[in-house]
Amino acid sequence: MRRYYSSEYRVDYKGRSTPSLRHIARSGRGALNRYRELAPYLRRGDRILDAGAGGGEVVYVLRQLGFDASGLEPDEQYARHAREALGVPVATGFVQDATFPAGSFDVVTMYHALEHVEDPCAILSRLRGWMADRGVLLVEVPNVEAACIAPGHRFHFAHFYNFSGDVLEALGRKAGFEPVQTTTSPDGGNLMSVFMAVAQPQPPRFDAANYRRVSAAVRGHTALNYYGSASPYTGPFSRLRTYVTDRRAAQGCETPKQVLDKLIHRSEINL
């Protein structure tokens, strides 16, 4: 598993060992959106760790916006790209192997990484140990109840776990966090939970109704239902629009930094 995620996963998923300028543009737009999601919880100078930092776009954007951000990324080539092409502190390694003193971070983010780990609770508990009391953890994962993807694509080959909102919140409580809010993306495909690191979280709550709801959602999401909805027909146009937007964002740029700086400038976020 470790060999796969340190050297093979990105090639399988993205088709290359380092991100293209177009992929950097997409990740950069995503990083700006993630900053907007984080902004209500941030204070100037916060120490932020992006666990599963990919090519370092989130770390770069946050540092440009005045935060003390760093990252941890298991893929050797992507972590090296972040350090060399973007000049940001992204260490190569797995959360389960890394060590930081208690209270090292005010904020930890984990975007589409928790579903890839063998023991999600152990990972969140480890992150909690590195965080300041009342620090903020933001986790984004695919939504197992999503109806916007084809039934045959619900369970990704590289995902160890799948999450509903209730399960994600219970997992956070078990690891030493108290849920602040959980939201679903507009298309229903992703869940985002914001947690606060606390000394004594409420005990996890397990509701049989959650099992029944998730089970019904998975069983009920048939090919007939999916192809009778708008998702399979609007999806290709959405992907084409995203592709064109990414190409335009990267147009005229020669380096990853130029792509991200252009996006930050156009975002009109106050630096």
PLM-predicted stretches and their roles:
Residues V139-R173:
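Short, glycine-/aromatic-enriched active-site segment of Class I SAM-dependent methyltransferases
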